[in-house]
Curated annotation (Swiss-Prot):
Assembly, per entry: Homodimer.
Binding-site residues for Mg(2+), renumbered to this chain: D61, D63, D112
Family the UniProt entry places it in: Belongs to the tRNA nucleotidyltransferase/poly(A) polymerase family. Archaeal CCA-adding enzyme subfamily.
Keyword Metal-binding: yes
Gene Ontology biological-process entries: RNA repair; tRNA 3'-terminal CCA addition
HAMAP family found in the cross-reference section: CCA_arch (MF_01264)
Keyword Cell membrane: no
GO molecular function: ATP binding; CCA tRNA nucleotidyltransferase activity; metal ion binding; RNA binding
Enzymatic reactions: a tRNA precursor + 2 CTP + ATP = a tRNA with a 3' CCA end + 3 diphosphate; a tRNA with a 3' CCA end + 2 CTP + ATP = a tRNA with a 3' CCACCA end + 3 diphosphate
Organism annotation: Thermoplasma acidophilum
Protein name: CCA-adding enzyme
Length: 222
């Protein structure tokens, strides 16, 4: 029988690492908010990702979003987002997704500073990354400490078999998908049990628009 607590003890962040992440993230958030005030921007820093949800594994990274009011034109949040990102990560590199963003390291921790639009439940997204703010809120409202460790176990398992990660080279299980599966099935073992019995495609799509082997509806979508 697998000793899950022993597995978690090897992959869960140490208290020292958690303290380092907290100090670095608090400092960056303070700097971003100060810059936003000085530039009279209606925007604020928000910590998102697995660290914000307490499902992070050891040697993880930090995702910090700059959430702008929804009436800003896209070119403004792109320009200001890059300016702020470079200001708080001096040696950062520009990367490009739906919005350009700045990625770099501080104190040995990989950090992404990403601009987005503010979004509340029921709002239509303006850009794809906007929902990330709601993902954090949703997961934190549906996972307790035990559930967070169950997510960690699912992440560890999917990493070990090479199916963790939503990027094009993998098309696997994202961290958010792992969180939603544990919320739905309550435990790592229940998730594995469900997929071990699933036949063919796992699909919930009344309009039959998708051909993916598995489809899970994002609960924060209106």
């Amino acid at each position: 029988m697998i000793d899950y607590q022993e597995v978690l003890s090897r992959y869960r962040p140490t208290q020292e690492e958690e303290n380092r992440l907290r100090i670095i993230s608090d400092d960056i958030i303070r700097k971003i908010n100060s810059i936003c005030r000085s530039r009279r921007l209606r925007a604020e820093a928000v910590i998102v990702g697995s660290y914000a949800k307490g499902t992070n594994l050891r040697d993880g990274d930090l995702d910090i979003f700059i959430a702008f009011d929804r009436d800003y034109p896209e070119e403004i949040i792109n320009t200001e987002g890059l300016h702020i990102g470079h200001a708080v990560i001096p040696n950062g590199r520009e990367k490009y997704a739906e919005h350009p963003y700045v990625s770099g390291e501080i104190g040995g921790v990989k950090i992404d500073v990403v601009p987005c639009y503010k979004m509340s439940f029921g709002d239509r997204k303006i850009s794809a990354v906007d929902r990330t703010l709601l993902h954090t809120e949703y997961v934190n409202g549906h996972l307790d400490e035990k559930g967070r460790d169950e997510v960690r176990l699912l992440k560890i398992f999917t990493k070990s078999i090479g199916v963790y990660g939503a990027e094009a080279r993998t098309f696997g299980f994202s961290g958010y998908l792992c969180e939603l599966l544990v919320i739905r099935f309550r435990s790592f073992e229940n998730v594995i049990r469900y997929f071990s019995k699933a036949k063919g495609r796992v699909l919930i799509d009344p309009d039959e628009r998708f051909r993916d082997p598995m489809l899970l509806i994002d609960p924060v979508d209106p």
